[in-house]
């Protein structure tokens, strides 16, 4: 793809799909700075391909573990498997489309693709951030308000909540599908007309400002603010619990407190990864939306934009590996899946892991949860 094609717009006309244009040229397009090297258009899709492959391996393995290992089917893990499903959907649909813009000078996926791809990606982003919010709420209830937990039909209720998250995410993405279209754009300075998949016409500078700000608030600021409030109360409760615990307290109680801390930290790591990976993409889109009439063809802007896009998609492949590092039981199951074709190693893994299964705080024999008495309250413990 000729980088000059995108130089006419100072923003990715779709915050999740960079501009893919079909030109009707009457004059030579304005050239970007001399820094651009043609090899970049092959390196970037290769990086996309690496992200897709790694993400597929991690998320498919994670979903397979939660579907086939009965002891892993609990409240937090059900949310995490829903999160993995959303990431998987993003990687197999939107990531290849995003990579294709560097290899083609035109939009390859027609009008239907122009409406469907933004819808899928916004749905996936919604599933990710709203599931993280639900996970934070679950940790808040388990740690701060354990008396509110009801053991009966816990998994069924969580399944309904996960389904509701998908429905809400799809409803919020409907405007993206309705208004996204192959819009003709005309550049007065060069007398060029091109077709681009965009969520709004090019005629009004207010459209990108509204679109970028709404996306930033609904899919980033508001959910992360809610999560921050939850974690403030979680941290405060854990600190108070540590102070109130007797010096020679019950060993089981101490283990339960440590389990709660690990679970809260796991969810917090997921939240931190999402915030870190998606913030640059939102910031760049806001910058472009509020500098709509200007054109930035600098190397810094180009590299920053590419890195922001790659970082956003990287978020869809890192969660399984973060869970691998944080959870002993998931690490064991992940190794079991990878070593399934090596019986001797698999048997050795089972024999060494069986003695520690009952001690790890990330695995439960109860499909929904376990309950214990801590500081006079019934405490709900989920596992990852």
UniProtKB/Swiss-Prot annotation:
Compartments, as annotated in UniProt: Cell membrane
GO CC aspect terms: plasma membrane
Residues bearing PTM Phosphoserine: 351
Tissue-specific expression: Expressed in the hippocampal CA1 region (at protein level).
Main localization of the protein described in the UniProt heading: membrane
Any single Pfam family the record assigns to this protein: 7tm_1
Glycosylated sites: 5, 20, 24
Disulfide bonds: 114-197
One Gene Ontology biological process: phospholipase C-activating G protein-coupled receptor signaling pathway
Molecular-function GO terms, alphabetical: bombesin receptor activity; G protein-coupled peptide receptor activity; G protein-coupled receptor activity; neuropeptide binding; neuropeptide receptor activity
Keywords, comma-separated and alphabetical: Cell membrane, Disulfide bond, G-protein coupled receptor, Glycoprotein, Lipoprotein, Membrane, Palmitate, Phosphoprotein, Receptor, Transducer, Transmembrane, Transmembrane helix
All ranges on the Cytoplasmic side of the membrane: 64-77, 138-153, 236-265, 327-384
Family of the protein in this entry: Belongs to the G-protein coupled receptor 1 family.
Purpose of the protein: Receptor for gastrin-releasing peptide (GRP). Signals via association with G proteins that activate a phosphatidylinositol-calcium second messenger system, resulting in Akt phosphorylation. Contributes to the regulation of food intake. Contributes to the perception of prurient stimuli and transmission of itch signals in the spinal cord that promote scratching behavior, but does not play a role in the perception of pain. Contributes primarily to nonhistaminergic itch sensation.
Name used for this protein in its record: Gastrin-releasing peptide receptor
Protein's gene: Grpr
């Amino acid at each position: 793809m000729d980088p000059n094609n995108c130089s006419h717009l100072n923003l990715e006309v779709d915050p999740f799909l960079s501009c893919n244009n079909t030109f009707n040229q009457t004059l030579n397009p304005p050239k970007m700075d001399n820094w651009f090297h043609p090899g970049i258009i092959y390196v970037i899709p290769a990086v996309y391909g690496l992200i897709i492959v790694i993400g597929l391996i991690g998320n498919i393995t994670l979903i397979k573990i939660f579907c086939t290992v009965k002891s892993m089917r609990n409240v937090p893990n059900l949310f995490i498997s829903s999160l993995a499903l959303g990431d998987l959907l993003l990687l197999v649909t939107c990531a290849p489309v995003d990579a294709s813009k560097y290899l083609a000078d035109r939009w390859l996926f027609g009008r239907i693709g122009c409406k469907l791809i933004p819808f899928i990606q916004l749905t996936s982003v919604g599933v990710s951030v709203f599931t993280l919010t639900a996970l934070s709420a679950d940790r808040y209830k388990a740690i701060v308000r354990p008396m509110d937990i009801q053991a009966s039909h816990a998994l069924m209720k969580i399944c309904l909540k996960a389904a509701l998250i998908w429905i809400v995410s799809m409803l919020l993405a409907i405007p993206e599908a309705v208004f996204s279209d192959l819009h003709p754009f005309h550049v007065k300075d060069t007398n060029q007309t091109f077709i681009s998949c965009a969520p709004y016409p090019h005629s009004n500078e207010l459209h990108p400002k509204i679109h970028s700000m709404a996306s930033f608030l609904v899919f980033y600021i508001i959910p992360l603010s809610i999560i921050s409030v939850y974690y403030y109360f979680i941290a405060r409760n854990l600190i108070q619990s540590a102070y109130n615990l007797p010096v020679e307290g019950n060993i089981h109680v101490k283990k339960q407190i440590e389990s709660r801390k690990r679970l809260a930290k796991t969810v917090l790591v997921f939240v931190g990864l999402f915030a870190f990976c998606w913030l640059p993409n939102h910031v760049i889109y806001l910058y472009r939306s509020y500098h709509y009439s200007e054109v930035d063809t600098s190397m810094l802007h180009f590299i920053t934009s590419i890195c922001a896009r790659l970082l956003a998609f990287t978020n869809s492949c890192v969660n399984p590996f973060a869970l691998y590092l944080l959870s002993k039981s998931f690490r064991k199951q992940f190794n079991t899946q990878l070593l399934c074709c090596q019986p001797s190693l698999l048997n050795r893994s089972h024999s060494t892991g069986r003695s520690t299964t009952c001690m790890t705080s990330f695995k439960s024999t109860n499909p929904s949860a376990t309950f214990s008495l801590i500081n006079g309250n019934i405490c709900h413990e989920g596992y990852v």
